[in-house]
Amino acid sequence: MYRVGIGFDAHPLEANKKGLYLGGVKVSEEYSSIGHSDGDALIHAIVDAILGATNAGNIGIWFPENEENRGRRSTEFLEIIRKKILAGKYEILNIDSVIIIDKVRMNPHIENIRLKLARILGISKGNINVKPKSGNTLYGNSVSVYAVCMLKKVGT
């Protein structure tokens, strides 16, 4: 049985020296996203896509905005979802994503992002696609991400 899920996340950006993380990779020293956790919109969208494909709720149910998750690295969210939702039950066939951001040029970071996500999920980077778009100034000081994943239920 095949399952498909879609995820979306968006965060405003602010100029500072904390740095912006997308896909677990620092992509900017000049900006950071404003969020309860580390604000990694790419991982948040992927987590929601996986949860949607498995009918397991959404990121807010699994990782609510509480003190435990304040400032938490989103890579931990993805690791938990891999262990509790995917492990032994589903195989990731494909993840496709679009990052819309005006402030940061993403192309130099795409391969590192794909490698990082592949390591966390235990899959080939060939199963992960990340497409950056500038937004043509329509999105201003923000980052928005759409992600889709296709899973196969193990044993079917």
Curated annotation (Swiss-Prot):
It catalyses: 4-CDP-2-C-methyl-D-erythritol 2-phosphate = 2-C-methyl-D-erythritol 2,4-cyclic diphosphate + CMP. The keyword tRNA-binding does not apply. Pathway: Isoprenoid biosynthesis; isopentenyl diphosphate biosynthesis via DXP pathway; isopentenyl diphosphate from 1-deoxy-D-xylulose 5-phosphate: step 4/6. Its EC number is 4.6.1.12. A divalent metal cation binds at residues 9, 11, 44. The keyword Metal-binding applies. Binds 1 divalent metal cation per subunit. It is an enzyme of class 4 (lyase). GO terms for molecular function: 2-C-methyl-D-erythritol 2,4-cyclodiphosphate synthase activity; metal ion binding. Homotrimer. This is 2-C-methyl-D-erythritol 2,4-cyclodiphosphate synthase. It comes from Kosmotoga olearia (strain ATCC BAA-1733 / DSM 21960 / TBF 19.5.1). The gene is ispF.
